């Protein structure tokens, strides 16, 4: 998946990275490279947490089954 992120230099010199498409998905780094690495981890964690939340919201009688789909 492709996400757009914003990078902004904070007053303390750190680079703040945010993914506007994912509310609250923000990270930072000492430089642009580290900020981008960290926001990738934050996006992965955000998506995992959202997946867990969605799965927990399913009715228990829904019968969740994992499947593999090639894209």
Please name every model-derived segment.
Residues 19, 25, 46:
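Functionally engaged cysteine thiol sites
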């Amino acid at each position: 998946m492709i996400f757009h992120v914003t990078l902004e230099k904070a007053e303390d010199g750190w680079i703040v990275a945010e993914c506007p498409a994912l509310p609250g998905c923000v990270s930072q780094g000492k430089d642009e490279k580290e900020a981008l690495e960290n926001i990738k981890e934050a996006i992965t964690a955000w998506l995992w947490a959202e997946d867990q939340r969605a799965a927990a919201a399913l009715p228990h009688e829904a019968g969740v089954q994992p499947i593999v789909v090639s894209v």
